[in-house]
Amino acid sequence: MRPQATLTVMPVERPLVGRVSPPGSKSITNRALLLAGLAKGTSRLTGALKSDDTRVMSEALRLMGVQVDEPDDSTFVVTSSGHWQAPQQALFLGNAGTATRFLTAALANFEGDFVVDGDEYMRKRPIGPLVDALQRMGVEISAPSGCPPVAIKGKGGLQAGRIEIDGNLSSQYVSALLMAGACGKGSLEVALTGSEIGARGYVDLTLAAMQAFGAEVQAIGDAAWKVSATGYHATDFHIEPDASAATYLWAAQALTEGNIDLGVASDAFTQPDALASQIIDSFPNMPAVIDGSQMQDAIPTLAVLAAFNRQPVRFVGIANLRVKECDRISALCDGLCAIAPGLAVEEGDDLIVHANPALAGTTVNALIDTHSDHRIAMCFALAGLKIKGIHIQDPDCVAKTYPGYWDALASLGVSVQR
């Protein structure tokens, strides 16, 4: 574990103006790394994110015989035979949900014994529904606790057929099955059950990346896809900036009435979290009810921004936030109440933020327990732009997805004190 250092964000008294380039998308980078590792040949991934989550994915690929070179700070060059070797050790993936779920399904396509494991936080994050789905497909796989570690005995390829999985649970399970399906023994149909598809936009990201690497995917209605067993071919692939990271900068601009140039328009993003830009643009008149089901990683940003809104905001469709890097609903509620008692309340799996614009310009003594969750650390820094006395615990946890976050704020004139 990282030592529990503390960082204090000092309020700003002027609009934030400048240019900041967000890092590459974590979601797309880890999809591209996986697909490049499954492809035959050499792929060049540009605009990529270099962070804790992408590091563990690239290191796992290296352990299985894939060559992953890093010629600069935003490029991966991946050379693979398309066949992975079982390593002598467990694949340790930290707290990277994308790497853990994507690799768990992909490993069923190869011969050998594999163990997928993570840190103490990842060992609390569910993977049972994906394991159950793979078991129904005939894969010899187990995760006794319903969370990592996961043991997989690969037999050289997923069986052809049809698999159903509840689309409400996690889009990462769906994406994992889709990406693995192209390397199986025959066509695989992945069908979603449940009343809604959670974070459908991330499934669309997966399908676009698969097709860029040569997969043949046919939509069957609105909630099923047939993936042909074509495998993948190497390609050059450019990764757009991270929309979740952009939300902090959009919110900082809104809070300070500034002008921060990200080098890319909000409507140019393909990631679902970019939907948050429209809500941020409505500040301080954000809607009374916000459905977060399709932009879950943006909810921490919006929740802190809502504290300064002109009316209370209820966040719905966010139950999956309870099984992210931490229970983000509780972490957000606790952090907001550390700033002002009663500022937020949990109601079932909804979060209600009782807006109080008068908080701006006040002084508190709020120690924010981030639970080593990068998004909790980054979103509460926004509160520090308007309120004196916001202290962020374990600030270096931002390295999971945005290692340069504190430097980015400093470049805009924000004083951060350790």
From Swiss-Prot:
User: For this chain's UniProt record, which GO biological process terms are given?
Assistant: amino acid biosynthetic process; aromatic amino acid family biosynthetic process; chorismate biosynthetic process
Give the domain of life: Bacteria
Where does it reside?
A: Cytoplasm
Cite the binding residues for phosphoenolpyruvate.
Answer: 26, 97, 125, 172, 328, 375, 400
What GO cellular component entries does it have?
Answer: cytoplasm
Keyword Transit peptide belongs to the record = no
Q: Where is the active site?
A: 297
Asked whether the UniProt record includes Transferase among its keywords, one would answer yes
The EC designation for this entry is 2.5.1.19
GO terms for molecular function, please? 3-phosphoshikimate 1-carboxyvinyltransferase activity
Q: Pfam families this protein is in? A: EPSP_synthase
Q: Which PROSITE patterns match?
A: EPSP_SYNTHASE_1
Q: Where does 3-phosphoshikimate bind?
A: 26-27, 31, 170-172, 297, 320, 324
Q: Which InterPro entries match?
A: Enolpyruvate_Tfrase_dom, Enolpyruvate_Tfrase_sf, EPSP_synthase, EPSP_synthase_CS, RNA3'P_cycl/enolpyr_Trfase_a/b
Q: Which UniProt keywords apply?
A: Amino-acid biosynthesis, Aromatic amino acid biosynthesis, Cytoplasm, Transferase
> What does it catalyze?
3-phosphoshikimate + phosphoenolpyruvate = 5-O-(1-carboxyvinyl)-3-phosphoshikimate + phosphate
Q: Which HAMAP family match?
A: EPSP_synth (MF_00210)
Give a short account of what the protein does.
Catalyzes the transfer of the enolpyruvyl moiety of phosphoenolpyruvate (PEP) to the 5-hydroxyl of shikimate-3-phosphate (S3P) to produce enolpyruvyl shikimate-3-phosphate and inorganic phosphate.
- Recorded protein name is 3-phosphoshikimate 1-carboxyvinyltransferase
Q: Per the UniProt entry, what species is this protein from, by scientific name?
A: Pseudomonas syringae pv. tomato (strain ATCC BAA-871 / DC3000)
